[in-house]
């Protein structure tokens, strides 16, 4: 499953759990799935961040440069 699908599924799980009308077993099952998806998405974001750093590692003058990739929306 790609990142976008995992994130979409995670959003579905959150919406279902926020309603508060699930049985305990179903809540636990969805929570477990959500934690797994969250970890996988976080790992993929870390990989993407590392790739951005690598791609931006050489400046216009040819000198190595490390630029941290941070979102200003956070």
UniProtKB/Swiss-Prot annotation:
Location within or outside the cell: Cytoplasm
SUPFAM superfamilies: XseB-like
Entry's Gene Ontology molecular function annotations: exodeoxyribonuclease VII activity
Enzyme class: hydrolase
GO CC annotations on file: cytosol; exodeoxyribonuclease VII complex
Family statement: Belongs to the XseB family.
HAMAP family: Exonuc_7_S (MF_00337)
PANTHER family: EXODEOXYRIBONUCLEASE 7 SMALL SUBUNIT
Described function: Bidirectionally degrades single-stranded DNA into large acid-insoluble oligonucleotides, which are then degraded further into small acid-soluble oligonucleotides.
Protein name as it appears in the record: Exodeoxyribonuclease 7 small subunit
Organism (species): Bdellovibrio bacteriovorus (strain ATCC 15356 / DSM 50701 / NCIMB 9529 / HD100)
């Amino acid at each position: 499953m790609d990142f976008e699908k995992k994130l979409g599924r995670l959003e579905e799980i959150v919406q279902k759990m926020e309603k508060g009308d699930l049985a305990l077993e179903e809540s636990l099952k969805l929570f477990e799935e959500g934690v797994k998806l969250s970890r996988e998405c976080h790992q993929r974001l870390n990989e993407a961040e590392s790739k951005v750093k690598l791609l931006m590692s050489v400046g216009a003058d040819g000198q190595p440069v490390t630029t941290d990739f941070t979102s200003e929306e956070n």
